[in-house]
């Protein structure tokens, strides 16, 4: 979604990696 894109762009790759890890843990990705 655009929110994930915006968050990744604004917060940086660290936030994106954290979000991806969170999704992977919950199996949502």
UniProtKB/Swiss-Prot annotation:
It is found in: Secreted. It comes from the Eukaryota. The keyword GTP-binding does not apply. The keyword Ligase does not apply. InterPro entries: Galanin, Galanin_pre. One of its GO terms (cellular component) is secretory granule. Keywords: Amidation, Hormone, Neuropeptide, Secreted. One of its GO terms (molecular function) is neuropeptide hormone activity. GO terms for biological process: neuropeptide signaling pathway. Transmembrane segments: none annotated. The modification Alanine amide is found at residue 29. Contracts smooth muscle of the gastrointestinal and genitourinary tract, regulates growth hormone release, modulates insulin release, and may be involved in the control of adrenal secretion. Belongs to the galanin family. This is Galanin. It comes from Amia calva (Bowfin). The gene is gal.
């Amino acid at each position: 979604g655009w929110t994930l894109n915006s968050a990744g762009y604004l917060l940086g790759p660290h936030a994106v990696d954290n979000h991806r890890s969170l999704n992977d843990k919950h199996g949502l990705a």
